[in-house]
């Protein structure tokens, strides 16, 4: 392997800046105002303010950028700083830069359904340097219940008359097809599609974005990426912790709405779609929509639901089940685990099961895409060979590896499982992988919508899952109990085996670089 030249963070950011300023979408000299609606909330504190700080620190924001927080709470910039700065990971050497960052911050308190409050917000923005002609970016870090009032007030009161206006909308985008359509129709009546950025932070993750390059930038994968060679595809999202006392919010949505209908389905689109005409945002999203239109509604026979119970041999949180969370309604049947099988009914993928599996309180933290290939024809090794697999590890320790058979060292002619491995932390030792929110917020400044969800994508995603969700809620389907810290319900493994996935349990990827 060629030796990597060490790059400092300054050098890496310099390359990024050069790339950014080459295009017409990013005008360094323009004034930009980044408005955080819901600035007092957890998302703002833990993700949005830290992300804006990292972009500012690394010189990736336009120079004349202001950050305005807005919420109902009576706060000051000092209050915002105390809440969010612990998540900044700032070093003592960055203190001067940090002071400069907060000098560009301000805060306005107001109601979400009161036009007078938004008039005050607009007056404040106009008072900033070139504020009346600035580009304005509104981040709605808010519960969906206030989206309609907030977007209406933004449109009527706070729009820039000269610069561009863009709105970032956080999931959940509704609870089913009907509520999602209602919300989409409302927002679309106020803003053009090129002003709306529906954010799914998984689309900002390094390995998720890498899926397109792996598929369409490598000749070796093209001829084998189809039903003739691939037996099944598994998308996995596992968390080793439960609801941690915040189950009341989770109980409203459940694991399918929280993870599967968005994160996992978006990854499925990137694996299954045809090659787009270009990397233009709409060309990519057109192909994703085509894939979704080829997927039928989920069948109840292709679903396993689970809910974790306490582990009597565990410690601390592991001893508590989902129903032990005091914020969860008594007797709740909300699933904390789900395994679902989908089929893409087109020429490339006819008959190939796409298995989506996600859950809380499982045995490890992991998100990955696993393509399992068909058995080798004409076996000459007495069934000692296991299926090849291509694995894209999204987290932790981003990696791409191929599980394959090699000869075991020694006197005898025995095959054994091994891997070809690309672990990002080893190959790119001195490159800081950007946080997903860093990529996505920077994309909004640049006007790139490739990694955001379009309205027709959203509609097709809800079409696939809404009948199942309504069936579960109507029938009060009882989830299968599984122990905190386990792999999940054994019935999920049985479902996967039934549709064609072969799990031998003889091999586990070990990070060879001990990150």
Swiss-Prot record:
Membrane topology type? Peripheral membrane protein
N6-(2-hydroxyisobutyryl)lysine, modified sites: 171
Annotated active site: 263 (proton acceptor)
Task: Write out the residues that bind NADP(+) 1.
Answer: 38-45, 72, 147, 171
Post-translational modification Phosphoserine, affected residues: 8
Question: Sites of the modification Phosphothreonine?
Answer: 10
Source organism superkingdom:
Eukaryota
The UniProt entry, under InterPro entries, shows: G6P_DH (IPR001282), G6P_DH_AS (IPR019796), G6P_DH_C (IPR022675), G6P_DH_NAD-bd (IPR022674), NAD(P)-bd_dom_sf (IPR036291)
The UniProt annotation places D-glucose 6-phosphate binding at: 171, 201-205, 239, 258, 360, 365, 395
Q: Which residues carry this modification: Phosphotyrosine?
A: 503
Keywords annotated in UniProt: Acetylation, Carbohydrate metabolism, Cytoplasm, Glucose metabolism, Hydroxylation, Membrane, NADP, Oxidoreductase, Phosphoprotein
Identify the pathway.
Answer: Carbohydrate degradation; pentose phosphate pathway; D-ribulose 5-phosphate from D-glucose 6-phosphate (oxidative stage): step 1/3
Catalyzes what? Answer: D-glucose 6-phosphate + NADP(+) = 6-phospho-D-glucono-1,5-lactone + NADPH + H(+)
Q: N-acetylalanine modification sites?
A: 2
A GO MF annotation of the entry reads: glucose-6-phosphate dehydrogenase activity
Q: How does it assemble?
A: Homotetramer; dimer of dimers. Interacts with SIRT2; the interaction is enhanced by H(2)O(2) treatment. Forms a ternary complex with ALDOB and TP53; this interaction is direct. ALDOB stabilizes the complex inhibiting G6PD activity and keeping oxidative pentose phosphate metabolism in check.
| PANTHER family to which the protein is assigned, alphabetical | GLUCOSE-6-PHOSPHATE 1-DEHYDROGENASE (PTHR23429:SF0), GLUCOSE-6-PHOSPHATE 1-DEHYDROGENASE G6PD (PTHR23429)
NCBIfam families tied to this protein: zwf (TIGR00871)
Q: What does this protein do?
A: Cytosolic glucose-6-phosphate dehydrogenase that catalyzes the first and rate-limiting step of the oxidative branch within the pentose phosphate pathway/shunt, an alternative route to glycolysis for the dissimilation of carbohydrates and a major source of reducing power and metabolic intermediates for fatty acid and nucleic acid biosynthetic processes.
UniProt protein name: Glucose-6-phosphate 1-dehydrogenase
Q: In the UniProt record, what gene is named as encoding this protein?
A: G6PD
């Amino acid at each position: 392997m060629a030796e990597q030249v060490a790059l400092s963070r300054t050098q890496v950011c310099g390359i990024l800046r050069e790339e950014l300023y080459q295009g017409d979408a990013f005008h360094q000299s323009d004034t930009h105002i980044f408005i955080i609606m819901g600035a007092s909330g957890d998302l703002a504190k833990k993700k949005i303010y830290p992300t804006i700080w990292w972009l500012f620190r690394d010189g990736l924001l336009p120079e004349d950028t202001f950050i305005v927080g807005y919420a109902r709470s009576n706060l000051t910039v000092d209050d915002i700083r105390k809440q969010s700065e612990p998540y900044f990971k700032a070093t003592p050497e960055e203190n001067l830069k940090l002071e400069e960052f907060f000098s560009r911050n301000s805060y306005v308190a107001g109601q979400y359904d009161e036009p007078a409050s938004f008039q005050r917000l607009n007056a404040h923005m106009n008072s900033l340097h070139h504020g009346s002609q600035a580009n304005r970016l509104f981040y709605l870090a808010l519960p969906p219940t206030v989206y309609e009032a907030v977007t209406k007030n933004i449109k009527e009161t706070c729009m820039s008359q000269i610069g561009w206006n863009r709105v970032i909308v956080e999931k959940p985008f509704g609870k089913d097809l009907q509520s999602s359509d209602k919300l989409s129709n409302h927002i679309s009546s106020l803003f053009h599609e090129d002003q709306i950025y529906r954010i799914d932070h998984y689309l900002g993750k390094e390995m998720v974005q890498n899926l397109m390059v792996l598929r369409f930038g490598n000749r070796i994968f093209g001829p084998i990426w189809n039903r003739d060679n691939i037996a099944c595809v598994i998308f996995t999202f596992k968390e080793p912790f439960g609801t941690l006392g915040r189950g009341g919010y989770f109980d409203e949505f459940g694991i399918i709405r929280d993870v599967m209908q968005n994160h996992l389905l978006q990854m499925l689109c990137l694996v299954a779609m045809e090659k787009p005409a270009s990397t233009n945002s709409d060309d990519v999203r057109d192909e994703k929509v085509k894939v979704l239109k080829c997927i039928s509604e989920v069948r109840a026979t292709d679903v396993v639901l689970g809910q974790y119970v306490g582990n009597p041999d565990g410690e601390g949180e592991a001893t508590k089940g989902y129903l032990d969370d005091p914020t969860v309604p008594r007797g709740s049947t909300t699933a904390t685990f789900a395994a679902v099988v989908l089929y893409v009914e087109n020429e490339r993928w006819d008959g190939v099961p796409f298995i989506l599996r996600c859950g809380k309180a499982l045995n490890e933290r992991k998100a990955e895409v696993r393509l399992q290939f068909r058995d080798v024809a004409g076996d000459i090794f007495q069934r000692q060979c296991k299926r090849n697999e291509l694995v894209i590890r999204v987290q932790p320790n981003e990696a791409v590896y191929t599980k394959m058979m090699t000869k075991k060292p020694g006197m005898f002619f025995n095959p054994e499982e091994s891997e070809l491995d690309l672990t990002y932390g080893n190959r790119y030792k001195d490159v800081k992988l950007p946080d997903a929110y860093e990529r996505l917020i920077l994309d909004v400044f640049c006007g790139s919508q490739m990694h955001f969800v379009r309205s027709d994508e959203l509609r097709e995603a809800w079409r696939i899952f809404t009948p199942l969700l309504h069936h579960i809620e109507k029938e009060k389907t009882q989830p299968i109990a599984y122990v905190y810290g386990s792999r999940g319900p054994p019935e999920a493994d049985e479902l996967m085996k039934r549709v064609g996935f072969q799990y031998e349990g003889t091999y586990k990827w070990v990070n060879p670089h001990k990150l």
